[in-house]
């Protein structure tokens, strides 16, 4: 069945989103055209502005339309002395929602993966090392993902921290709150046992 070239183009464009296949893209396109054209126009305008105006923070590399993001520009955060290293800007959002961290961040935009040709320079470790050498940083909290690549990246950064006599710590990984022990995978359970804490009364 032949369809409008513009409709085909819209569906193809929507497929660039994660988890969106041909059927989902078709449903989205038909919904916007049939029921929510004003929403489609708002989406188009927001996408156009975001793609042209959002760049990276000069300090932490997260997304921002300013030269420096609001977290890095916060004087209280600057005095904290802690930097939390994460793999993506989405990780910052997740950590900020906990309200448990009051320092600044550094976004790798990925992780080390020699098999894929991704080395230290590709994830900005040269810029991180520059910050470690120039700023009064007391601790680097490594919050990379609990994967083989994430662990390798954390270990690599910990070695850099040691060169500058800066404390490096790894976020704890373990059994999720509300989870059942029998449903937890072996690797997670191993991390939980290794990272156990004493109970103080």
UniProtKB/Swiss-Prot annotation:
Gene Ontology BP annotations: DNA recombination; DNA repair
Disulfide-linked positions: none
Keywords: DNA damage, DNA recombination, DNA repair, Metal-binding, Zinc, Zinc-finger
All copies of domain Toprim, residue ranges: 81-176
Single Gene Ontology MF annotation: zinc ion binding
ZnF C4-type: positions: 57-72
Family annotation (NCBIfam families): recR
Family the UniProt entry places it in: Belongs to the RecR family.
This protein's name: Recombination protein RecR
Lineage: Bacteria, Pseudomonadati, Pseudomonadota, Gammaproteobacteria, Enterobacterales
């Amino acid at each position: 069945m032949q369809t409008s070239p513009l409709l085909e183009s819209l569906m193809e464009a929507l497929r660039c989103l994660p988890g969106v296949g041909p059927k989902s893209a078709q449903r989205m396109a038909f919904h916007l055209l049939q029921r929510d054209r004003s929403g489609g126009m708002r989406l188009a305008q927001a996408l156009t502005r975001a793609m042209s105006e959002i760049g990276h923070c000069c300090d932490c590399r997260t997304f921002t339309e300013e030269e420096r993001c609001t977290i890095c520009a916060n004087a209280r955060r600057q005095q904290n002395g802690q930097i939390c290293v994460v793999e993506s800007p989405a990780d910052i959002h997740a950590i900020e929602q906990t309200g448990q961290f009051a320092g600044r961040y550094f976004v790798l935009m990925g992780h080390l993966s020699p098999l894929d040709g991704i080395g230290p320079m590709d994830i900005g470790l040269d810029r991180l090392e520059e910050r470690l050498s120039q700023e009064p940083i007391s601790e680097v909290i490594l919050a990379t993902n609990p994967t083989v690549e994430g662990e390798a990246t954390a270990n690599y950064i910990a070695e850099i921290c040691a060169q500058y006599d800066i404390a490096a710590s790894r976020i704890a990984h373990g059994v999720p709150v509300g989870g059942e022990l029998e449903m937890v995978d072996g690797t997670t359970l191993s991390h939980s046992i290794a990272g156990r804490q004493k109970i103080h009364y």
